Curated annotation (Swiss-Prot):
Assembly, per entry: Interacts with ROBO1 and GREM1.
Positions annotated as glycosylated: 72, 192, 406, 571, 630, 762, 801, 806, 1026, 1079, 1186, 1256, 1303
Protein species of origin: Rattus norvegicus
Lineage, opening ranks: Eukaryota, Metazoa, Chordata, Craniata, Vertebrata
Domain (CTCK) ranges: 1456-1531
Keyword field: Developmental protein, Differentiation, Disulfide bond, EGF-like domain, Glycoprotein, Leucine-rich repeat, Neurogenesis, Repeat, Secreted, Signal
Protein name: Slit homolog 1 protein
Amino acid sequence: MALTPQRGSSSGLSRPELWLLLWAAAWRLGATACPALCTCTGTTVDCHGTGLQAIPKNIPRNTERLELNGNNITRIHKNDFAGLKQLRVLQLMENQIGAVERGAFDDMKELERLRLNRNQLQVLPELLFQNNQALSRLDLSENSLQAVPRKAFRGATDLKNLQLDKNQISCIEEGAFRALRGLEVLTLNNNNITTIPVSSFNHMPKLRTFRLHSNHLFCDCHLAWLSQWLRQRPTIGLFTQCSGPASLRGLNVAEVQKSEFSCSGQGEAAQVPACTLSSGSCPAMCSCSNGIVDCRGKGLTAIPANLPETMTEIRLELNGIKSIPPGAFSPYRKLRRIDLSNNQIAEIAPDAFQGLRSLNSLVLYGNKITDLPRGVFGGLYTLQLLLLNANKINCIRPDAFQDLQNLSLLSLYDNKIQSLAKGTFTSLRAIQTLHLAQNPFICDCNLKWLADFLRTNPIETTGARCASPRRLANKRIGQIKSKKFRCSAKEQYFIPGTEDYHLNSECTSDVACPHKCRCEASVVECSGLKLSKIPERIPQSTTELRLNNNEISILEATGLFKKLSHLKKINLSNNKVSEIEDGTFEGATSVSELHLTANQLESVRSGMFRGLDGLRTLMLRNNRISCIHNDSFTGLRNVRLLSLYDNHITTISPGAFDTLQALSTLNLLANPFNCNCQLAWLGDWLRKRKIVTGNPRCQNPDFLRQIPLQDVAFPDFRCEEGQEEVGCLPRPQCPQECACLDTVVRCSNKHLQALPKGIPKNVTELYLDGNQFTLVPGQLSTFKYLQLVDLSNNKISSLSNSSFTNMSQLTTLILSYNALQCIPPLAFQGLRSLRLLSLHGNDVSTLQEGIFADVTSLSHLAIGANPLYCDCHLRWLSSWVKTGYKEPGIARCAGPPEMEGKLLLTTPAKKFECQGPPSLAVQAKCDPCLSSPCQNQGTCHNDPLEVYRCTCPSGYKGRNCEVSLDSCSSNPCGNGGTCHAQEGEDAGFTCSCPSGFEGLTCGMNTDDCVKHDCVNGGVCVDGIGNYTCQCPLQYTGRACEQLVDFCSPDLNPCQHEAQCVGTPEGPRCECVPGYTGDNCSKNQDDCKDHQCQNGAQCVDEINSYACLCAEGYSGQLCEIPPAPRNSCEGTECQNGANCVDQGSRPVCQCLPGFGGPECEKLLSVNFVDRDTYLQFTDLQNWPRANITLQVSTAEDNGILLYNGDNDHIAVELYQGHVRVSYDPGSYPSSAIYSAETINDGQFHTVELVTFDQMVNLSIDGGSPMTMDNFGKHYTLNSEAPLYVGGMPVDVNSAAFRLWQILNGTSFHGCIRNLYINNELQDFTKTQMKPGVVPGCEPCRKLYCLHGICQPNATPGPVCHCEAGWGGLHCDQPVDGPCHGHKCVHGKCVPLDALAYSCQCQDGYSGALCNQVGAVAEPCGGLQCLHGHCQASATRGAHCVCSPGFSGELCEQESECRGDPVRDFHRVQRGYAICQTTRPLSWVECRGACPGQGCCQGLRLKRRKLTFECSDGTSFAEEVEKPTKCGCAPCA
């Protein structure tokens, strides 16, 4: 039947056709949409590293490539990818995926590549890939898969690459790989596989890469087929080894003969146990009975998968489980009790317990839980017991327990909870017991409801108490009255020793500022703190992170930045960063600036910056980067500014900057570019691109040096022959001596003596066997991901307690066939993941008990081929290996004789007996010096390299000092020579020959004339040990060096101590400096070439001259001009201020209280005494009044301002509040009070504004209090004075009588900066009464530990201490030595912490001042002029003189001298005391001078020093100090 058009439709389309059009339009719109946080380019959707917790919605239907890696996705639901029929590549690696629902990939029929590696998958659902016929590459490595089911890969018939390595696979079902006939790559290494069904790999003719090593293969009859299969394929399956039985352990499977694959019992008829995957099974390490699965204390780090579905109780306490993944217990619907106590759990998935309708007991105490996710207990309607005590929970959401209507006991004891939202326990209708103690509760107004709840429901049995505020500290919450729970800005709620969390009802918490750092707003300042790594806990609200000027060397990929979604800027400049791990900045998508200036980076690769998708500025200045390749900046498409200034860059690969699509500024200056053919592209690229570069220049070759790259013609970029292919490729992360495959590094049989450089930091398996190591390389501890280390067949003779530190992930350690004799007790400390340890083939005789205390996961110990001494000291090892059969039955005893040849595993422990001490040879292995190996009184020392070392006495050598060195017994030295035996390897001798003989045995007469000294024609005649000179007639002396008689005393013509020298021509005079002439008789004129300056006169002296300076000049050459005129001359600083010359500018340093350019104004006053005041008399009639002043006091009451009489305005402090009384002429008068109190000792600003009939009062800029009066408007009365701080008695009485003031007390404290109508008032223009002193000492200089600071005392601020405290700073308990003292008529004076003495009043004496009658004062008549009187029993009253004085009455001043001083130099600037940052040395001139002279500095030294002041400022200034004192005319 034909379809008729719908009424109103002009197009004539039927309803189905309209729906089709609408669907097509919607599909077209959906194809172009892009999910939030993702970027879409063509058919690629990139959502990696955005912090997603679930698959985003609205993915375009035409997507072909989807990047979801590096997020926090926990589960893949069936419909997450529905409709993505064109998807070819799906990246899901590096998430938290714990489960994938069957059918999730059914719509993706074009899917070719799927990566699910590095997740938390435990179970692989069957038929998961049944509709993915195009799938060619599947990566499931680095998960927690425990089995491969038969139908796991059914449907994926085109699969070529399958990676299953690094899981926990222990079972492979028969036929699991049967359909994969096109498979080329299969990895099953690093699992727990013990056996494999027959012919599992026979259907893979194209297989070229196959890995099965690092498993637990048990080579019995069921695995015989694998040996033949591997032999037929010698290039694959390398290093596949047997782990059992003991006789085959360590052998390559391909090398084991068929006859050696044997089975016990029925032999080959025995069947391989099938994988029970459907209904679950009891985990191997647990025990199961009657529905209870017991896995207590088994060293588990994760919850076992594939548990029995029928279990009703699971016990997992006392393990190392760190998290509860999504849906961990959901399949086990019959569970009634779960015990996860005493683990390391820090995270719980919201749906971890989903669907457990029968659960009545959940035990989670003793973990590290900080947060309970929303809905984590949802649906647990039958739960009766919930134990959450002994965790680190800091916040509970109000709806956390909304479904627990049947809960009877809830324990939140011993957590970090500071507050609970009202209604948290409302849904707990059946609650009978509640534990809340040992939490740092803040008992403010927000917790009032809890007190009411506990009084109404007395179910809290642990005595929960308040931690703050101080007034309620340690009081039980249920016993505090409701009105005590109040919120006050004055009270501090931070609890020392706890983390300060800022929480709301939704538990969106932010941690406090990192230790030692400063946080202001959203900026975290951690610069200059010598940090070696980035702090682990940073507030999530941080927008700028400053880490510059520290000592950070490696940036580790810890996932820190995934939590900092608001971060915009990171500053890591001026550190020591040499390595950035790939993925370090994963999740930092909002960061726009990254500063890495002045570090030690040598290369950059894209993985370093992965996650910085929003980066716009990248600063890499001042590093050591030598080369930029085309993968260096991949992914940084938004970078606009890139600075590579001042690096070591010589070349850049073509296309290196092509991915930087937004680049506008590129700084390449100060780099040594080698402008050869490799760089030709860059010159052309710079000319074509419109970006700012600063014109980088060539450094090489010489003919292009300093020429800008863009100015070099293309033909001039030339290469030498053979260099055309040399490019800038990233260095391979593998040493030259080794072979690397993924994270496996093999350096076997390379004669290595030290660890090669360049081993990748992420190495997991390191093979160093067959080398020449004598010690375990110390650098191994830097590779924290190591899982296997093979050091077998080396020459290692000893281990230390730190040989294997930081190797917490190590599972296999092979030390076989070395020279180990002794194992230190802590050698394996911290190796909690170690499962296989091989010490086979060493020289170990004993092991100390407890050596394996930390290796709790150890299941295989190889200790055979060692001479074990099986006495009582090794009994523990026998018992230990029998538990779990950790030793395969190879190790045998070598002694004592009755135990020789017996197996360690099967010999009863009681047979290990001590009949006496072990032999010396056994004991000496751990203490080799016990056997006294050093002979001839040599000294023995234990040595980690040589086992022991002998220090030999003189005359012996050799390892044990056994070789004598007496080579002189045959008297080989002739002619009286002395023989000396040599020490050392040659054991020779030397002869000390007498004078005149030489040679090895002193047999040759020495020709002494070879180096004779005869001169002037003298002839040498040889003797024995000497020679003589035969001189001509005119010479004499031993060497004929003297002329006869020419310079005798009678004939010597030389004057002025000149030296006479005889010559054949006659005597010659050699003058002393300063004289000249033939006879040295003339004084030389030294002023001939003098250098005196500034018109100075030269004065000739002997061999020198002096400069006589003109007036005003000084210096050795009169080079120092007169000192410039002091700028303070003519400057008059008032009120006792000093003038200081600062940079040729006079500055007045005011005394406390004064201000102004010349300190002419008194701005602050201190009301010290009672009944004092200031009086302003010259006031003006102002129609409006605006009065502002700053006040500091600790008093409750006091008058601040008063003006007028009948028409008045009064400002007073009343009970800590500011009260303003105002009467414009109407009655009654009006008054307002401030909401704030200001009597806390701190300065507060009081502002009073009157306008017409209105008065505004504001404290510290806060919200004003307003008062309106309908009388006439008020004006400041010029006829009546303005009183400040008090008023006269008559005025006070009148005002009090008229209720204008409520308390007549005068003000006691500080007032400063009084403004009247914006004019700063000068207190010197007032009538100041006694008791008012200038200046205010602010409380910021005084710290009162247990009290309140008050800045109103005459000497300065004082502390008002709390009860029980005393001392200047309220820091001394009152129960000091003077507490309860016995002084009757006197004052107690503490001598130390325990003792005191009594200082008696006049008229009393005695130790306790209890004797009447004053003791005669011995010093009464003695007047010491420069010192003080002192009385003693031996000398009576005498004077003790001050330094520089002497005499009986200290009346004689000592001679002028300089007393050395080393101290800080101090000056005062205003209120601040400033001192130098370091001490300096000078002399203090003291003493008297004869005549009219003065003792003063003769030599002065000027230096420029840095000062730091008490107010936080600093400055630099020249200081002149004397270094030498003496008498000189008085200045």
